[in-house]
Amino acid sequence: MDRGAPQASASTVPVPPEMMGELRSSMDELLELDWKEAQQELYPTSLLFDAPWLDWAVRYPLVWLDLPSIWQRRTRRDVTDLPLEINTKDYPDYYLQNFHHQTDGYLSDRSAELYDLQVEILFNGTADAMRRRLIRPLLDQLGARRADPIRVLDIATGTGRTLRQLRGALPKAQLVGLDLSASYLRQANRWLSEIPGELPQLVQGNGEDLPFANGVMQAVTCVFLFHELPGDARQKVLDEAWRVLEPGGVLVLADSIQLDDSPTFGAVMENFRRVFHEPYYRDYIADNIPERLQRSGFEVIEANSYFMTRVWTARKSG
């Protein structure tokens, strides 16, 4: 497989000053909306101040100490520098690489411990605010059922940051998080154990082949996964989400903005692809997600963009 490793010193597309202003305005609008929806009690205001600052303060020097390793991989254009002890047969081929030059890919405790801090640095502290954009459409579609002990599956849950937002908005829900990485699930367990209430069920597995029976979930969420999947894998994940949802169940999908919905930020998307190792990003930003949803059997309800995130809401007919 061609991993599409970026150049060691990637040339970038110039970002004009006016675009920087538009990015700043878009980020401010996201943060204002986040505060407004918390004030409307869609989720606790405490979630807006939920970042583990003391933990990150300890790990921040580790991010800097990791930079020489990242630069060495970039120089070698090595995007398959993974822990030797992993069994590669346990993972799909597209997963076995150093996405955005992450040390160990997604396959070590060290990677899992640094990941959330690295993402917040990249997105200027807005990652959780973007994750919370799935809450309003999810609650709207659930209606009165939001107070019931419904089952909600989060595909590619990673370190559990989305589950943490969902726990705040749906305190009675039975939450399930699925991820390919045992290391990231261990980190998720640590984060989620800090909050009151029932601990979400954490399951190691592949979104293309969900280990659940047909029609057992009332809602499915999936955040920041699709841009790291080849097209056929995206379709399989949607097919599986449709399968495990009950008739009338809701899917809320959040991922990077795309060229069609945010053409103004095209240079930013191009630079993201060039600088970071994101081998499927170019294909993703041109992909027709509503068409894929319909192909799986979903009815697309709405799609909206917030800063760097696009959110699609869809329902399984029945």
Go through each PLM region and give its residues.
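Conserved class I S-adenosyl-L-methionine
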Residues: D148-G158
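Class I SAM-dependent methyltransferase SAM/SAH-binding core
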Residues: L153, R161-D209
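A short SAM/SAH-binding and catalytic strip from SAM-dependent methyltransferases
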Residues: Q218-D232
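C-terminal alpha-helical "lid/dimerization" subdomain adjacent to the S-adenosyl-L-methionine
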Residues: Q235, V252-S296, V300-Y306
